[in-house]
Amino acid sequence: MSKTPSYEDATACQAALFEWAESYDLKDWNRLSKCIAPTLQIDYRAVFGQFWEAMPADEFVGMISSPGFLGNPLIKTQHFVGMTRWTQTSEDSVTGRHQMRVAHQKYADAQMKEVVLKGHGHGGATTWFRKVDGDWKFAGIEPEIRWAEFDLDKIFAE
């Protein structure tokens, strides 16, 4: 099965995608935990060379919210999602293909006045969604960085 999902299913997946992006940018880990599937496929090979075929939700939230990643209070992000193409791959699975721009800034201290690093990724992402107990949940991501501005590779380096 490979078809365009119904309007209702596509907008429900879009809502889950919005919650995912907003939770990252607002560092709202409780919000993140509510919009994700119990297990996720995380293909971060383009980001830091790692792939997880079936990462449990609590491990995913722990990784994302860690001080070495988005949990660093000195790092601000905006995960901007552009145009999307949706494909329904089964009754309870939808794949999204998105244009993406992800901006990152790292600040010198908690006053958030002096930017010490900038790094912005441009490209796309494939995302997966799974229907869980009647609700569409974010179930994974594979970013594709086509090009970067500034020092994206240094944002999460210690």
From Swiss-Prot:
Function, in words: Scytalone dehydratase-like protein; part of the ergochrome gene cluster responsible for the typical purple-black color of the ergot sclerotia. The ergochrome gene cluster produces several ergot pigments including the yellow ergochrome secalonic acid and its derivatives, as well as the red anthraquinones endocrocin and clavorubin. The pathway begins with the synthesis of atrochrysone thioester by the polyketide synthase (PKS) CPUR_05437. The atrochrysone carboxyl ACP thioesterase CPUR_05436 then breaks the thioester bond and releases the atrochrysone carboxylic acid from CPUR_05437.
Protein induction: Expression correlates with the formation of the sclerotia and thus the pigment production and is directly regulated by the cluster-specific activator CPUR_05433.
Species this chain originates from: Claviceps purpurea (strain 20.1) (Ergot fungus)
Protein name: Scytalone dehydratase-like protein CPUR_05428
Binding positions for substrate per the UniProt entry: 24, 44
Pfam families: Scytalone_dh (PF02982)
Gene Ontology biological process terms from the UniProt entry: melanin metabolic process
Parts forming coiled coils: none
E.C. no: 4.2.1.-
Protein origin, superkingdom: Eukaryota
Functional pathway: Pigment biosynthesis
This protein's UniProt keywords: Lyase
